[in-house]
Structure formats: structure tokens, C-alpha cells
Amino acid sequence: MAWDDVSRWQPVDLAASFKMGDAVQPVDVRDIGYRESDAQVKNALRIDPMEFESQIAGLPEGKELIFYCDRPGEATSLKIAMWAFDNGRSRVGVLVGGWNAWQDAGYPVEPKAG
């Protein structure tokens, strides 16, 4: 797995892809930030970053999985995206700037599930 196997999505590009109906699926992999937040990216699925290996299989096939976190340098997102790629998911990406960039830009959020 190389860094260039993981696409980098700017928040503006992910927001535009939603409007165009592109086959993308945001995946929230925040840890403490998730517990402390009451919101997530609109239509995001959630996997626990401490248990991601067992939860990746439950994510939809046929869509590019866009992982986001709130760690500097997308550290958690990149780790999980690289693992997913190495384990058969050919379309993976990370949201540049993660949750904070998405929220700061004012893009759609929703109450987190559960």
C-alpha cells in the first residue's frame, strides 16, 4: 500500500459529490471527538477506530469509502483507509482536514446515530 493509493478529498469536493449523486460513502472514524460531539457528516456511517478491522466488512461495496477523523494529518483516517485498501477495498479516500475542516466550512451535518 502506498500513500497514492488513497485519494485525498477536500471538503468542497466531497460536498459537491453528494449533490451530484456520486457513489461515495463518508465513514466517521473519530474516537474521543466522536464521543464528545453530537453531530457527524450527513449520511456518514460510523466505525469504531479501535475495532475497524472487524467492521470494514460491514461497509457498503461499490462506493468509494471516504474516512474522516479529527487527528492531525488525517492520521486515523489514513491508517484505516490504507488497511481497507490492503484488504480488498480498491476505492478508499480520506477527508483532508477531517471533521474539523468539514464543520468549519459549514457543510451538512446531522445528529450522530445512537
Show the residue positions of the predicted features.
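Flexible, polar/low-complexity N-terminal or interdomain linker segments that lie immediately upstream
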Residues: 1-37, 111-114
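Conserved beta-strand scaffold positions in the cores of enzyme catalytic domains, especially
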Residues: 26, 44-46, 92-94
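A generic "binding-loop/recognition-motif" signal
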Residues: 31, 52, 98
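Glycine-rich nucleotide phosphate-binding loop and flanking beta-alpha elements
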Residues: 33, 53, 73
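Short, structured coil segments at secondary-structure junctions
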Residues: 40-42, 88
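Short, hinge-like loop/turn segments at secondary-structure boundaries
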Residues: 43-45, 109-113
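Alpha-helical scaffolding within the catalytic cores
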Residues: 49-56
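Catalytic cysteine-centered active loop of the rhodanese-like fold, especially the PTP/DSP P-loop
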Residues: 56-102
